[in-house]
Regions:
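Glycine-enriched, solvent-exposed interface loops adjoining structured elements
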Residues: 1-219
Length: 219
């Protein structure tokens, strides 16, 4: 469905939400917000082949929002993650790195085996000792603006099945605006259940994130 069709379907199924209650202009603004929210929750917009980051000797961190257009997060599900020299490296926490070696911050440069995140930054567990190999990051992306009469979710045809999520989003927002007892909670529950199902169908619920269990109990 294109944007106008989504709004028409919403009004058809919610006749009490007239234009006096919710103007088309306000609904279109909500749809743009909903497009961003749904993509963020379901992580449905991902890059195709990952982004190659050219490395230099002694590099130990990178600004991912600078290196990757519309970067939202690292895609940590199977087929994603971060690789160095085409080998996957582990995501860790600073606490895990401290547990493994209290002197990791001062270790000599070499081949990174892991990384940790700080917001938009990715930090390697050691600085790189050569510019011979590249880092590759597979990312979840921020969707394109949904401000025209086109399909949502970057107009990706394989996501057309899930356009109904935006009808549930409009319904949730409208019921919250009206404030009828019981209806607001029901609309919120329906929206949440749909997104949970959508994420599962897209893969986030079928596969778990890749982690490696260590003998010391840390992952």
């Amino acid at each position: 469905m294109i944007r106008s069709e989504i709004l028409s379907k919403f009004r058809e199924e919610n006749p009490e939400i007239t234009d006096r209650v919710l103007t088309d202009a306000a609904a279109y603004s909500w749809l743009e917000e909903g497009n961003r929210e749904i993509c963020a929750i379901t992580r449905c917009i991902v890059d195709q082949d990952g982004t190659t980051i050219t490395t230099a000797e002694d590099d130990d961190h990178y600004d991912l929002s600078d290196k990757i257009s519309k970067f939202a997060d690292i895609d940590t599900y199977p087929g994603g993650g971060v690789t160095y020299n085409d080998k996957r490296i582990e995501e860790k926490t600073i606490a895990q790195l401290d547990h493994e070696s209290s002197s990791w911050r001062s270790r000599s440069s070499g081949t990174p085996k892991g990384y940790y995140r700080r917001g938009k930054w990715i930090y390697l567990d050691r600085s790189i000792d050569s510019n011979e190999y590249d880092l590759k990051v597979y990312a979840v992306l921020i969707p394109d603006d949904f401000n025209d009469d086109v399909m949502p979710f970057n107009e990706l045809e394989y996501l057309e099945t899930y356009h109904y999520a935006l009808i549930y989003y409009l319904q949730k927002r409208a019921k919250m605006k009206i404030g009828k007892t019981g209806e607001e909670a029901k609309a919120l529950q329906e929206y949440g259940s749909y997104l949970k199902w959508m994420k599962k169908e897209l893969g986030g619920g079928k596969y778990t994130e890749i982690n490696y269990t260590k003998h010391n109990g840390y992952k």
